[in-house]
Amino acid sequence: MVESTKEFDYIKIKLASPFRILQWANRKLPNGQFVGEVQKSETINYRTFKPEMDGLFCERIFGPSKSLECACGKYKRVRYEGLICERCGVELTESRVRRHRMGYINLIYPVTHVWYINSRPNFMALLLEVEEFEKKLDTTYTTHSENCKKCDGLKLTTSTVVDLWDERVKRIKLASLAYFIAEDEISFYGIHWDLQQYRRSRELGYTGYPLKPYPKPQNRRYSTPKYLLRATPNFLIGAPLIKRELEKLNLKSEIFRMRYFILVCTKVLNKEKPIYDESRWFRKWEQQRIYKIREQAIKRIRILENLVGTGSSPAWMILTILPVIPPALRPMIQLEGGRFATSDLNELYRRIITRNNRLLRLLEIDAPQLIIRNEKRLLQEAVDTLIDNGKRGKIALSANNRPLKSLSDIIKGKHGRFRQNLLGKRVDYSGRSVIVVGPSLRLNQCGLPYEMAIELFQPFIIRELINQGLASNMKIAKNLIQQNESIIDPVLEKVLKSHPIFLNRAPTLHRLGIQAFEPILVQGRAIKLHPLVCSAFNADFDGDQMAVHIPLSLEAQAECYMLMLAPYNFLSPANGEPIIMPSQDMVLGCYYLTVNNINGLLGSSHYFANLADVILAYSQSKLEIHSAIWIRLEEQEINESILLKTTILDDETKIEFYENLQIRKTKDNQLIVQYVQTTTGRAILNYIIQKTLNFL
């Protein structure tokens, strides 16, 4: 087997074309036969317990169940590897190919992708400009504006609101077309005529659809000639009609047209803003309507640009070829007693194949259109359930009333394929533990449990023991570590001093979800985390767990120090604002530390030469945290306006008393010393800030 090591920079997920799905699943055998289409809903034979041919576990499509052994048993040797059995058509290869070989179902009737027709916003409706998408920008409504600017004569009636809205676009409901739900038969054909007229008007250069108010839609059952219904073929209703309209979209010209339309909306809003500000409900309503039109146009242009950027066609939202994932990813396991446990996906695929084959038989016998439409709707619902169970309508249940697990359920969520199996999988040189707060840590530090550090850094400890001559080989070094000898601790501290670690908290929603720290050994089994970095990780201390990863190469360690340390990730990449900000108990602690006006405390009215003397007295319990004290200041002028009193001493010097200041001067008014009144807590806060900024 040839292993390929192709390098790549990123993975792009986009719409798959029917041709690409066939490339995944369709294979040509040496005898010229094509295999890959799953035609039967059977899984395994109930007598032989072997996969049924052309079924969901077919060995001809997905590969042999047993390595180098065909289905009929004719070939069972390694020397036949690569041979295709002429009797059963199975290729003799490894059974592991059943993990990546795909199949496909050729749908008789195209179906819509449930993610795009039942999403918010509705992508198909935005692209086709139907349902709630307004196509009219009416800024020439002059019936009342010239006579009465504030529109006092205009009364709010149903007909007025109908005139202001383009009601025609609301006729076309894509869900009604796809699921055959409507009041009258003509609604199934509405998109064919309305969009045709709309597209023709745009090709002629019109910016709006109807430039005059359109009457309220009525039931068209009695006003439509019967021959028009008979002239429209049945394959032009439902999903095929939506597919045809999506194929007709010229993406680049639509982008140009929408950009021009957005500019028109913006100019209208800027030009008529004074009128909107002065007017009453009518003009206010018109302003909100234009805002909504512009917002819808912006959403549409984003979808169009994404389609152009990925090289996708909007018609690929309609499925004609349905891929079948490999059987090893949806296994069927035999239990004790002869029963089988199977994945829910097999039941969902079985429903689709059964309904697809039944629809084919109904079309072959020319069944009534009512029955065929019902079968098409059932096929659409079966595909919806496979892709996303419960996205639209009732949730499909299994035999024991348990919701069936669809493809979306396998991918999304905490226990989905991405978060649990890819982002959260176990790797070497990593560990996991609960986090607790470590307020005494520096911002670039974290507390690493001793047991975890011994296990994670074991290779580095062994190398250091051998380099220092404390162990002659790896086996002796491992024995020293297992016996927890005292010589291990200084070696471990030396290793940790120059080796950073990564901390990661799932889900990693942005790049700040993984940051580097310098580890500090702590007792216990919990990781200590600085409280200021919690906002970047979106972490709290109610039982959250974090993963520890060890950078092995010198390049990775250099990247830790240069890019990924917590102090270097001060700003949020989303908006550029600081993401490391004090909150909760830190703010409360700062407030409590600086509270004053508490009288009668220990050490009040004492005088100190500097901040260090205050810290020393507080550490010796000579002061309380809120004691009012006096601290000498450097020679700097402080403007105090209200002089309370002046005292002249025996040496002819004087002391001026202000509200929070005492200044001693000579008889010539030269400054000798000055003291400012504060509290012990404020002195401590000031000392910490000055020491951090290297002012002390």
UniProtKB/Swiss-Prot annotation:
Manner of cofactor binding, per the entry note: Binds 1 Mg(2+) ion per subunit. Binds 1 Zn(2+) ion per subunit.
Domain of life: Eukaryota
Cofactor(s) named in the record: Mg(2+); Zn(2+)
Localization per record: Plastid, Chloroplast
One GO cellular component term: DNA-directed RNA polymerase complex
Record GO terms (molecular function): DNA binding; DNA-directed RNA polymerase activity; magnesium ion binding; zinc ion binding
EC number(s) stated in the UniProt entry for this protein: 2.7.7.6
GO biological process entries: DNA-templated transcription
InterPro entries to which the protein is assigned, alphabetical: DNA-dir_RpoC_beta_prime, RNA_pol_asu, RNA_pol_N, RNA_pol_Rpb1_1, RNA_pol_Rpb1_3, RNA_pol_Rpb1_3_sf, RNA_pol_Rpb1_clamp_domain, RNApol_RpoC1
Alphabetical keyword list: Chloroplast, DNA-directed RNA polymerase, Magnesium, Metal-binding, Nucleotidyltransferase, Plastid, Transcription, Transferase, Zinc
Enzyme's top EC category: transferase
UniProt keyword Magnesium present: yes
Residues holding Mg(2+): D540, D542, D544
Annotated catalysed reactions: RNA(n) + a ribonucleoside 5'-triphosphate = RNA(n+1) + diphosphate
Main subcellular location: plastid
Binding site for Zn(2+): C70, C72, C85, C88
SMART domains: RPOLA_N (SM00663)
HAMAP family reported for this sequence: RNApol_bact_RpoC1
Function of the protein: DNA-dependent RNA polymerase catalyzes the transcription of DNA into RNA using the four ribonucleoside triphosphates as substrates.
Known partners and oligomeric status: In plastids the minimal PEP RNA polymerase catalytic core is composed of four subunits: alpha, beta, beta', and beta''. When a (nuclear-encoded) sigma factor is associated with the core the holoenzyme is formed, which can initiate transcription.
Record-stated family: Belongs to the RNA polymerase beta' chain family. RpoC1 subfamily.
The protein's name: DNA-directed RNA polymerase subunit beta'
Organism the protein comes from: Phaeodactylum tricornutum (strain CCAP 1055/1)
Name of encoding gene: rpoC1
